Amino acid sequence: MLNLFILLLERVGLIILLAYILMNINHFKTMMSERDKWRSKFQLIIIFGIFSMISNFTGIEIENGHIVSGDIYYHLSKDASMANTRVLTIGVSGLIGGPWVAIIVGIISGLCRLYIGGADAYTYLISSIVIAIISGYFGHQTIKQNTYPSIKKGAIIGAITEIIQMGCILLFTNNLHHAITLVSFIALPMIIINSLGTAIFLTIILSTIKQEEQMRAVQTHDVLQLANETLPYFRSGLNEKSAQQAAEIILKLMQVSAVAITNKKDILTHIGAGSDHHVARKEIITDLSKEVIQSGKLKVAHTREGIGCHHPNCPLEGAIVVPLYIHNEVAGTLKFYFTDNNIISTSDQQLAKGLANIFSSQLELGQAEMQGQLLKDAEIKSLQAQVNPHFFFNAINTISALVRIDSEKARRLLIQLSQFFRSNLNGARNNTITLQKELQQVAAYLSLEQARYPNRFNIHYRIDDQCQDALIPPFIIQILVENSIKHAFKNRKKNNHIDVDVSMKQDYLSISVQDNGQGIPADQLDTIGYTTVTSTTGTGNALVNLNKRLTGLFGTTSALNIQSSQSGTTVSCLIPYKSSKEEHFNESVNR
């Protein structure tokens, strides 16, 4: 009996070893967390079906109360029986997967045992199904509660299921004397082994789940700590200063060799190993980062070639690169670099992904705050324009001069002046206005400018009829037209033309303002609309403000597009088309 116990212990060890290997595979861990889904049940049937066949074919032949052999068996003689771990695999399949998994595994195991043959082989098919129903019942209770049986409960169920098998052998046998001899020899070792094996199997599962929970807790703590310390920086936007401050904190708190943050084009910061050639303010040099920006998906590299850095002395051997999003559009990347590619773990990847999600949310919140601030700035500038001494007195002086010459025209200009002030104030208080109202604002502004400088410039409109009700951010066209008048023509007093073109391009509204002025110097063209410039006629801050509002509201696809030559300048943008009629309809429905 002791020999049988040791041989059975070896068989259980094989099953436990396979279980341990499976529980260290991520796919199996995911499957175990989704046991109530049929996809997972089907996979559990396959796995435990294979386990049950291994248990059958690695059994120990028993004849007349003695061990004959422990070899792998395909067929037994008619008087021989077998001691194996079949009940263990059926019982555990039921405790983990529930009744349907256990019943199908039980049928597979029973048919396999029937195929091997021996004395009363059909008995084992019956016992397999009975054991499956009982273990499946207990498993179903725990699946409903999203838990697992305790180790103690599993051990008791394991012993009970083996006792049931012994009962089936005695109940359904054709040779009671043979059955009693067999049960008296194998019962105690198999009951102990089955109980012990079930307990160990559940211990592996429960300990793995506990480790996963502890790892998640540590990851959550790390993510929250990092998020808490980097929170103030990403709220200010994705720029060089905020990126460097955040990267310094990440490098200090994480076990990585280097941290880098980029936008879609340039490296904003790189701190740690490889900083001699991964330099801020330069274009992205790694192929891996470009792939992430293109695909919008997390990428992991375990070799220098996978990173795609072409510097011959680059010390970086591994990397995790995660995209940063703003309003569902890739805005940049967060990169963790390693000089030892063997230490890149799944937890590092999950941590990087979690941080990227939090940083993306902070960037979106920061941008929303920036939009609110920009709108406030626009309102302040609008109010300032109303009391601006130069603009106000120039307009009043022009009207005063016209009162004696052409009182009717002076009256019309006063109306236009009041219209201009009113439109400025109303526009600053709204995120969008109709194109029609924007054009009225432009007309009011131009009438005052043309009164001061008669015949100095001509303006032409090409507006699609279907665009009149389109909603656009206020001051777009006015700022572009005003920019042309102030900067395009210098001291030229005639043959100055401005063309305003508004049309539909698929689902976008295309707005273009073109002049035939002197053009923008080539050294300033790339910075116009992004940074202020030094000029005797202004700083270009209005275009910077406008560009920020456009990209903040609609994304980078709506950024200002500036083309210039010696024959003139064209400033254009694309805005997602939305009709004021549609908005009014939606508001009326929601009331």
Swiss-Prot record:
Pfam families: 5TM-5TMR_LYT, HATPase_c, His_kinase. Its main location: membrane. The lineage of its organism: Bacteria, Bacillati, Bacillota, Bacilli, Bacillales. The keyword Transmembrane applies. It is found in: Cell membrane. GO terms for biological process: cell wall organization. It is a multi-pass membrane protein. GO terms for molecular function: ATP binding; phosphorelay sensor kinase activity. Its EC number is 2.7.13.3. Member of the two-component regulatory system LytR/LytS that probably regulates genes involved in cell wall metabolism. This is Sensor protein LytS. It comes from Staphylococcus epidermidis (strain ATCC 35984 / DSM 28319 / BCRC 17069 / CCUG 31568 / BM 3577 / RP62A). Keywords: ATP-binding, Cell membrane, Kinase, Membrane, Nucleotide-binding, Phosphoprotein, Transferase, Transmembrane, Transmembrane helix, Two-component regulatory system. GO terms for cellular component: plasma membrane. The chain crosses the membrane at residues 4-26, 45-67, 87-109, 122-139, 154-176, 183-205. The modification Phosphohistidine is found at H390.
